[in-house]
Amino acid sequence: NDVITVQTPAFAESVTEGDVRVEGGTPLFTLRHNLKLGFMSAFVKASAFALQEQPVVNAVIDDATKEVVYRDYIDISVAVATPRGLVVPVIRNVETMNYADIERVEVRPMMYVALTYDHRLIDGREAVTFLRAAVEDPRVLLLDL
């Protein structure tokens, strides 16, 4: 059926090889940022640069309008082996980060929370401040600290 063919994404994968040696400058980087410079930050930065140069690779097709939507941000997921198994954190807004910012990314337990409120009384800033306080340090609310 031609309709199904047009509506179903045709995913493909391309693989290539590249030299990822990190040479020189690493002792200075470690001294300046108190971080070890790894291959992953170079890979993430290179990917972000390539996505900025070829924005169609970071685009999506809007299901409702069937239009191509070019994202103005770059989020990259990287699989990381941990003692608990494979974890795939999302590094958000990579295009705004430098190598040190990327090396500082750490896997932390995350949780989504929502708050329904009367927007006539509460602005988004206050709602988010409340939610972050409740999630990031629940001891404050639970233990009346």
From Swiss-Prot:
Active site annotation, chain numbering: 119, 123
Cofactor stoichiometry and binding remark: Binds 1 lipoyl cofactor covalently.
GO term, biological process aspect, one: 2-oxoglutarate metabolic process
Domain Lipoyl-binding, first and last residues per copy: 4-31
UniProt keyword Cell membrane present: no
Superkingdom of the source species: Eukaryota
Reactions mediated catalytically: N(6)-[(R)-dihydrolipoyl]-L-lysyl-[protein] + succinyl-CoA = N(6)-[(R)-S(8)-succinyldihydrolipoyl]-L-lysyl-[protein] + CoA
Pathway participation: Amino-acid degradation; L-lysine degradation via saccharopine pathway; glutaryl-CoA from L-lysine: step 6/6; Carbohydrate metabolism; tricarboxylic acid cycle
Matches recorded under InterPro entries: 2-oxoacid_dehydrogenase, 2-oxoacid_DH_actylTfrase, CAT-like_dom_sf
Subcellular compartments: Mitochondrion matrix; Nucleus
Keyword annotations of the record: Acetylation, Acyltransferase, Lipoyl, Mitochondrion, Nucleus, Phosphoprotein, Transferase, Tricarboxylic acid cycle
GO cellular component: mitochondrial matrix; mitochondrion; nucleus; oxoglutarate dehydrogenase complex
UniProt function note: Dihydrolipoamide succinyltransferase (E2) component of the 2-oxoglutarate dehydrogenase complex. The 2-oxoglutarate dehydrogenase complex catalyzes the overall conversion of 2-oxoglutarate to succinyl-CoA and CO(2). The 2-oxoglutarate dehydrogenase complex is mainly active in the mitochondrion. A fraction of the 2-oxoglutarate dehydrogenase complex also localizes in the nucleus and is required for lysine succinylation of histones: associates with KAT2A on chromatin and provides succinyl-CoA to histone succinyltransferase KAT2A.
Name of the protein in question: Dihydrolipoyllysine-residue succinyltransferase component of 2-oxoglutarate dehydrogenase complex, mitochondrial
Lineage, opening ranks: Eukaryota, Metazoa, Chordata, Craniata, Vertebrata
